[in-house]
Amino acid sequence: TGRGAGSHELMTFSGTQPSQTKAMWDEVIREIPRMWEQKDYSFEGNGWSVPGPHNILPKPYGKGHPPIWVACGNPETFAKAGSLGIGAIAFNFEPIHNLKGRLEAYKEAADSPTEIIGQFQNNNVMMTNGVICLEDRERAREIAKAQGRGYLVTMVNLYHDTMPKSPDGITWPHAPASTLIEWTDEMLDQIIEAGYMLCGNPEEVSEQL
């Protein structure tokens, strides 16, 4: 789950504004388990409504339901996820070591949740990262230094246009900065050390983890 990132997502739903999404998420996160569990679901809320009864599909296969997660960026959201008993999804838009305080906020809140959303606590953090792992170490590093990899950042800047970005941030379709410079082994090592990427052979990647 999440509040949405960028006008491409938010404006699709009747012009939803970023300032509205926190309250809307608070409403919907508690309703998702009910949608899974009930065949005669209805809801009347401040941000949205389902005049009922409706059988919301699809439903989880078998007993129970999947773990519930929320995409997190700031410390408050990490702590809120922990307090609600749901998992936190983190992204490496900055050096991965900077997330230490946010992970601690999550774990502290998860130790004594004020509420459990759903049937069970999902006390986990999932963190995304770029990974290039090959038996051939040099080939993995060659791919990591390729110019095309930089297009990921330009796409993030395009679609996540409601998030702050650096003044020198480049947005697609403009060519990424990586096409203007020749990546060196030293530069790649700095990226790996900062936690922006895992790269190398299986032994190296395991060590980086």
Where do the language-model regions lie?
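Hydrophobic faces of well-ordered beta-strands that scaffold small-molecule active sites
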Residues: 1-3, 68-71, 86-91, 123-129
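Short intrinsically disordered, low-complexity coil segments enriched in acidic
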Residues: 1-7, 206-209
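Glycine-rich beta-alpha junction loops
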Residues: 5-7, 72-74, 93-96, 129-135
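Acidic/polar active-site rim loop that often engages polyanionic ligands
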Residues: 6-16, 83-85
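An alpha-helical appendage that flanks or caps ligand/catalytic pockets
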Residues: 19-57, 97-209
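A local structural motif
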Residues: 61-67
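A conserved active-site cap/scaffold subdomain adjacent to cofactor or substrate pockets
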Residues: 73-103
